[in-house]
């Protein structure tokens, strides 16, 4: 019992020191805690794969509105599938894309991460809410096919806006599902991806550090948005405030750390509208930040289920 209390006290002190000195600017950098690591890496934060998938989703949404009513359906569906299933080629980023007053650093997917797709991280269970007795992934393929045949992504008969349906569905079936039902569920158990071992061979971060980071990546926040009000977060997502987005002042917005994607964008949109009585944006961001500080404070020791 004494040792357990001592360990908890040490963790609390470490969190206080980390929070006041090294991590005051937001989510990272976080130091290497993996015991036995002898390389030159100093920051353990890594979630570029999740950012790549957000970009794939945004590009897919943009493509969903490019149909001309059937004439380009086959070619458009093939292009949309390359963003859903992934491609060996370095796909151009269709969205988000630079515009006047808001310059994006990356122009192609491999500049963020290679070998990523949406389909491999998509909910695969039954989806009875959609006609046809389909799985979750089959519904996505059906939506893509219908969007490719539509005129500008709109089905006049049903009123379906395929771009919106595909985007919202993907946010739930990929980003939310992966974060909540994978990285913050099974992979937070004491035995799965333990904190006293690397996430996989050859990396410099622990199993728990990376599991937490990947969940944060699916949340879609800018790493430096700590303390931002919802309006500022919303403006970054809408590409209307480069000054707030450009943390390092290089004149560009780095999609890997300075941009705001889907789930965080919608949290900010709710917080800034209506009665303004919610604070989803900062509550969730701060929970991720505090959790990462606690994992870092464990200093590479194993964490139990209760911890």
Q: What are these model-derived regions, one by one?
A:
Residues 25-307:
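Mature extracytoplasmic or organellar-lumen-exposed domains after removal of signal/transit peptides
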């Amino acid at each position: 019992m004494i040792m357990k209390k001592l360990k908890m006290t040490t963790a609390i002190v470490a969190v206080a020191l980390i929070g006041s000195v090294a991590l005051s600017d937001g989510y990272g950098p976080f130091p290497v805690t993996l015991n036995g690591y002898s390389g030159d890496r100093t920051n353990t934060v890594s979630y570029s794969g999740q950012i790549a998938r957000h970009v794939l989703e945004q590009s897919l949404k943009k493509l969903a509105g490019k149909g001309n009513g059937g004439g380009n359906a086959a070619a458009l569906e093939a292009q949309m599938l390359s963003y859903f299933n992934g491609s060996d080629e370095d796909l151009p980023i269709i969205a988000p894309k630079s515009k006047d007053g808001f310059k994006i650093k990356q122009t192609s997917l491999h500049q963020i991460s290679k070998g990523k797709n949406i389909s491999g991280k998509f909910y695969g269970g039954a989806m009875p809410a959609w006609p046809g007795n389909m799985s979750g992934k089959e519904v996505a393929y059906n939506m893509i096919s219908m969007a490719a045949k539509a005129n500008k992504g709109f089905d006049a008969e049903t009123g379906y806006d395929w771009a919106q349906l595909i985007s919202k569905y993907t946010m739930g079936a990929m980003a939310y599902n992966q974060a909540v039902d994978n990285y913050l569920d099974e992979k937070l158990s004491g035995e799965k991806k333990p904190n006293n071992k690397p996430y996989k061979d050859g990396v410099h971060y622990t199993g728990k550090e990376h599991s937490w980071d990947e969940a944060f990546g699916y949340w879609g926040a800018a790493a430096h948005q700590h303390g931002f009000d919802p309006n500022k977060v919303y403006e970054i997502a809408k590409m209307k405030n480069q000054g707030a987005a450009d943390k390092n002042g290089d004149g560009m917005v780095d999609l890997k750390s300075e941009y705001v994607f889907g789930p965080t964008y919608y949290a900010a949109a709710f917080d800034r509208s209506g009665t303004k009585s919610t604070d989803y944006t900062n509550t969730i961001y701060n929970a991720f930040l505090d959790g990462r500080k606690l994992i870092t404070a464990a200093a590479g020791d194993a964490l139990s289920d209760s911890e």
